[in-house]
Each structure stands twice: as structure tokens, then as C-alpha cells.
């Protein structure tokens, strides 16, 4: 039987705990340590070895009630998560303990820290993933096995858009999904669990939560916990996995909360100096290999709507598609409030999506860009000062802008409108008809919150 290696708590600084070990038992970086905190198990993760046989650790739960001199056990391994079929339909915390009041799984567990796949193992694919959301499919096509970021400030609809993607993709895709709730509202996690149960996608989904009420240690590691489950589905089962992370900014934020306590000098805007390294470690593991793919959708909170903030700016470089949510569009009552001019995808290329799709998408972007340029003239001089050509362009641009809106399935109970999914070919055809002037005699109001272009004609015919 292996000897139990024990140390003692030396200092407690909020979520950071120093533990002194005998020199021969000093744990390695990223090792999980365990102790009994008034009847409940507390897990610490070694972050630094600061000399004098002291391991500086980050707590995965509250440190209330800890005292100096308390015994700590070195588990001699990193934090591990249950993986495989046993986690489907279940809900876990950062250390792999169930939080759905069901028994703990007893099968295989994997460490949350592991190297990213090598270049030789990685696979590149340019298969389009249809979402049923018009603005996304037309202007920001998603790649199967790609990384997608949903950028937006507070209250512009990131979580609703992500839940809509879960609803549309998880239902049609038929593969397995992992949802990691990183530092977001517990209420939203609760709603998501019951919505998934109702729509019969829960048995194909694993959920991991480290919500905003939890200590920074849990919020810092929960994205890795969810990723570990997704990697196992990809590598051991050869599956195409969907990984949803809401919200990747909270991962960075949690790192900055403990960074100063760990004795690091802050860098730009007070973030941790290791920001790019930590983000890279996580993002490089979210990739497709020759065994299977991980398609990840990540919500990214943008502090004060500033896209140049180091946290969202660091995330940008890792993504294939960037969906930017705009408060100005949300204030017009148009949802999803996706900015067609700020959102980009590297798949919007005629060689990937085809010439017809590409040309319609470019024309939509051009007409909206010109409409934006004309806004100042309209505001000062009014529509009458525009040329006939520009007036026609403005009318069509408004119809295009309205037609980009769409009722969502997950917001049905708030809006009272049934959700709609639209096939890609119907989306392309609809925008082509607007741009070619086939809808010039229909009022722009009829283009709001509809699915196919045929619905617009029906709506207009009814109101004649």
C-alpha cells in the first residue's frame, strides 16, 4: 500500500492556500491536493512551488473554515474528470463530482491537464455546419470542427444565441455535446438543464458548471474539465463533438483574480501576465484530429463593449468565425443582434461556399455598408436629398436588415412567436430576391421576424 503523503496548511489568502510538505513529498505543479473542510472534501491545485518546501495552491471551493496547521493529502495526480458514456445526461462540478443528485459515476477518469494534439495528429476540414440561423449561415458560415466565438457586451443576447445553436445543431447534428458553464448565472444553467431534458437532447449531452458564485479556482478550471470530456468522446469514440463554453471571458477573469494573490505583476488593464499562454493552452486542445472533431462555440463577454480589451482580443486570434453582437442592432429590436459588418468567417470564400452563396453574401455586406455611410446624410438632410439610386438602395438595405432578424426557439416563451429554422438555399434565395428588386413593392415591416421569403409574400398578401 502506498504511503499517504501529507502536508500542513501554512497560510490562507482567500482562494490561495500555502501548504508546507516535507522536502521529499513536495508535489508537482498541477497536482490535486485534498483535505477535509468540516465534513466536505476540498480540492486544491498546486500552482507554484515558492521555496522553503511550500506549495502555493488555488482552491476549487470556498476556503471558509480552514485553519493553519490543518492536514492536506497529496493525491499525486492532477484533478480528474469522469469520461465516456457514463457522463451523458449528467451534470458535474469542476472536480467531477455530480451536482444533479444522482450517484457518482464509477468508470474511467482522465486528468484535466494534458498536451494539445501534435500537428501530425490534427485534421483540417472545411465542411460547412448549417445552423438554421439566416444571418449566420449566409454571412458567418461555421466550419465543422472549427472554433466559433460569440462576442458581445452585457445583455445583447450571447447566451440566447448559444442556446439557440444548441437547440438547432444538437438536434439536427445527432452527435454528442458538452456544455461548460464558466462563471455565468446559475439560473441560466438550471433553465438549460430542464430545456434540454424537455427537448430530448439531454441524453446526448454532458454538462459541467463552475458558476459566477464559485471561487475563481473553479471558474479557472471548469473549461478544462468540460474539454477533457469532449476530448475523450473525440479520441476514444471517434465522435464529432460539439463543445459549448459560456463564457470564455470568465476563464480569463478568474485567472486575473488569483494572479495578484499568486504574486505575479499585472500586465495591460490589470490582466495576468500569462493571459495569452493560458488562453493558448486551452484553445490549442480544442481541435479536430484524424480520430474525430470538436466543434466549439464560445461566448465571449466584451467588457464595456470594447473589442480591443486584451481578453476578447486574445481570443480573436484562435477562432475561425467571429460573430459580433451589436448593442445598436439590439436597441432597434432586431434579434439575433448580429453585426453583419463586424462579423467574419474564414469560410466565406467562393472555393468553400460556392460562387452563388459568396456573391449574395458580398452584395448583402456591400449594401449594408453603403447604407451605413448614407446614415449621416439621411439624419441631417433627410431622404429627399438622396439620388433616386441611393433612395432605392436605402429601401432595399432596410429590408435586408429586417430580413436578417429571426424568431428563436428558446425565446418562444418570452416573445410568443414560434421559433424558425431556415435552410441555407432558402436563405440565399431570399436575400437574392430582395437585392434583385423582386420585393421592391413590399413594405419593409413585412420582412421582420419571418423565415423564408415566401412568408414575406404571404404576409404582404394578407395585409393588402
From Swiss-Prot:
Localization terms from the record: Cell membrane
**Topology versus the membrane, per the UniProt entry?**
Peripheral membrane protein
Q: What is its EC number?
A: 7.1.2.2
Q: Which residues bind ATP?
A: 152-159
What is the top EC class of this enzyme, as a single word? translocase
UniProt cross-references to InterPro entries, sorted A to Z: AAA+_ATPase, ATP-synt_VA_C, ATP_synth_F1_bsu, ATPase_alpha/beta_chains, ATPase_F1/V1/A1_a/bsu_N, ATPase_F1/V1/A1_a/bsu_N_sf, ATPase_F1/V1/A1_a/bsu_nucl-bd, ATPase_F1/V1_b/a_C
List the GO terms this entry assigns under cellular component, sorted alphabetically: plasma membrane; proton-transporting ATP synthase complex
- List the SUPFAM superfamilies hit by this protein, alphabetically: C-terminal domain of alpha and beta subunits of F1 ATP synthase, N-terminal domain of alpha and beta subunits of F1 ATP synthase, P-loop containing nucleoside triphosphate hydrolases
* Reaction(s) catalysed (UniProt annotation): ATP + H2O + 4 H(+)(in) = ADP + phosphate + 5 H(+)(out)
Keywords noted in UniProt:
ATP synthesis, ATP-binding, Cell membrane, CF(1), Hydrogen ion transport, Ion transport, Membrane, Nucleotide-binding, Translocase, Transport
Provide a Gene Ontology MF annotation, just one.
ATP binding
Domain of life, per the record? Bacteria
The coiled-coil segments of this chain are none
tRNA-binding keyword on record? no
- The answer to whether UniProt assigns keyword Manganese to this entry is no
Q: In this record, what's one Pfam family? A: ATP-synt_VA_C
Q: Which family does it belong to?
A: Belongs to the ATPase alpha/beta chains family.
Name the job this protein performs.
Produces ATP from ADP in the presence of a proton gradient across the membrane. The catalytic sites are hosted primarily by the beta subunits.
The UniProt subunit note reads as follows:
F-type ATPases have 2 components, CF(1) - the catalytic core - and CF(0) - the membrane proton channel. CF(1) has five subunits: alpha(3), beta(3), gamma(1), delta(1), epsilon(1). CF(0) has three main subunits: a(1), b(2) and c(9-12). The alpha and beta chains form an alternating ring which encloses part of the gamma chain. CF(1) is attached to CF(0) by a central stalk formed by the gamma and epsilon chains, while a peripheral stalk is formed by the delta and b chains.
For this protein, the record's NCBIfam families field holds: atpD
Q: Which HAMAP family match?
A: ATP_synth_beta_bact
What protein does this entry describe?
A: ATP synthase subunit beta
Q: To which species is this protein native? A: Ureaplasma parvum serovar 3 (strain ATCC 700970)
